[in-house]
Design a protein with these regions (language model features):
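Extended, helix-rich architectural segments
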Residues: 1-143
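Charge-rich, acidic-biased intrinsically disordered regions
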Residues: 5-10, 19-22, 118-121, 262-282, ...
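Hydrophobic alpha-helical segments and helix-packing faces
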Residues: 23, 29, 36, 45, ...
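Generic structural signal for hydrophobic core residues of well-folded globular domains
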Residues: 28, 60, 67-71, 92, ...
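Short amphipathic alpha-helical segments
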Residues: 81, 89-97, 105, 232, ...
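Extended, regular secondary-structure scaffolds
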Residues: 112-227
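Extended, charged amphipathic alpha-helical segments
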Residues: 195-348
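C-terminal structural cap/anchor segments
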Residues: 320, 324-384
């Protein structure tokens, strides 16, 4: 309804965006519907679930660390303005929050940093693709956008919405809405925000900074939204988890078994008349089989484990995955049941990884510049 008030229908620029983001988010969390499978044991189908290395989440975290880390510096020619902006960023935990947001930008393709004033105190919101609706854009130059967020309160929950709409002659107008509901109701109640419901900024400086992944969204080349770094590597993620699950099954199914006649697995009577089992019935190493006229003797079975072959297969899948997401070949190393960053990797200025990092840095630099302009405009900081 709020979008209709502004003259827009929901997500008019990309109707499939929400569906894609939810799919990417499922893979980021780790286990999806694709991790469920069934095995028939001769009597019935048994439901099973693949184990997961959560490689999508780990790769997004490692990619984010290339950009928002302790080496990041913001330099402004006017040192007075620089100090004030740096103070605001530090008070809002910018480095940590931006790093967390960047992880989700890599996972979901899009993010936004939104500075605003709360009783004349500068605050910053960090929103991922699930909370962003782009309303008007020229490629990735966003003019109109809506942000929304749901937060829990002591009495229930609170829905906040703010839309940034550009008038080509007057500048930006920001429309704010707040809705609340308590734990006993299902519908939200609109709160009266007074003059804050419509803020005419009289400025053409947007009070938001957009973040994207550098790759074109090949699911919709006209979409203004970014693409998950692993959007084209989902089959590889599933392949990684299948091999990882096979490693666990190899150990589990390859355990030694001792097959004993069922009469040998029964009980003897001791001197006190108590029944005592010949073999511990809870010991899964023993398996009772029918006795064929006393001819069946104890038999033992054991299998050679294929740990080395499966480890090599997992490493090959990891190499394929890291090449697809921008970390380069052989970035991860699987050892002792864990995934480690390969410290032997050396990044050259002529490598694919380096070039992809520079493309992402260009997008981040532009967003930080826009953020600094927005903060300076909000705080009415004057200077070049």
């Amino acid at each position: 309804n709020f979008l209709k008030e502004l003259g827009y229908s929901e997500n008019v620029l990309d109707s499939e965006q929400e569906k894609r983001v939810n799919n990417w988010l499922d893979w980021y969390k780790g286990k999806t519907k694709a991790h469920i499978y069934y095995i028939y044991n001769g009597e019935k189908k048994n439901k099973c679930e693949l184990k997961s290395l959560n490689i999508a989440s780990q790769s997004c975290e490692d990619l984010s660390d290339f950009f928002f880390n302790e080496k990041l510096e913001i330099t402004i020619s006017n040192k007075t303005i620089q100090n004030k902006i740096n103070d605001c960023l530090e008070q809002n935990g910018f480095l940590d929050n931006a790093n967390s947001l960047m992880q989700l930008v890599k996972a979901l393709g899009t993010g936004a940093i939104i500075p605003y004033l709360d009783n004349n105190v500068l605050r910053i919101n960090y929103l991922n693709a699930t909370n962003i609706v782009i309303l008007r854009a020229n490629k990735r130059e966003v003019q109109d956008v809506l942000f929304w967020n749901v937060s829990k309160t002591l009495k229930g929950s609170e829905l906040t919405i703010n839309a940034h709409i550009l008038d080509e002659e007057k500048g930006y107008t920001i429309y704010n809405r707040k809705y609340t509901k308590n734990g006993t109701t299902e519908e939200y109640t609109k709160e009266d925000l007074g003059n804050l419901e419509k803020i005419e900024t009289n400025s053409f400086i947007p009070k938001f900074a957009m973040l994207y992944t550098p790759e074109i969204n090949n699911a919709d080349i006209n979409s203004p939204y970014g693409r998950s770094c692993y959007a084209n590597a989902i089959d590889t993620i599933l392949g990684i988890d299948k091999v990882y699950d096979s490693l666990d099954n190899e150990t589990w199914l390859g355990r030694k078994r001792i097959y004993v006649p069922t009469n040998a697995a029964k009980f003897n009577v001791n001197q006190n008349g108590d029944m005592t089992p010949i073999f511990d019935p809870s010991d899964v190493a023993f398996y009772g089989v029918p006795d064929k006229d006393g001819k069946e003797m104890l038999k033992e079975s054991s299998f050679d484990l294929r740990i080395e072959e499966l480890t090599s297969a997992l490493q090959a899948q990891l190499n394929l995955y890291t090449s697809k997401v921008g970390l380069g070949h052989n970035y991860y190393k699987f050892k002792d049941g864990e995934v480690y960053v390969n410290t032997d990797n050396v990044m050259s200025s002529n490598s694919d990884v380096y070039r992809k990092i520079k493309k992402q840095e260009n997008i981040i630099t532009k967003a930080i510049v826009q953020l600094c302009y927005a903060i300076a405009d909000l705080l009415k900081l004057k200077g070049k």
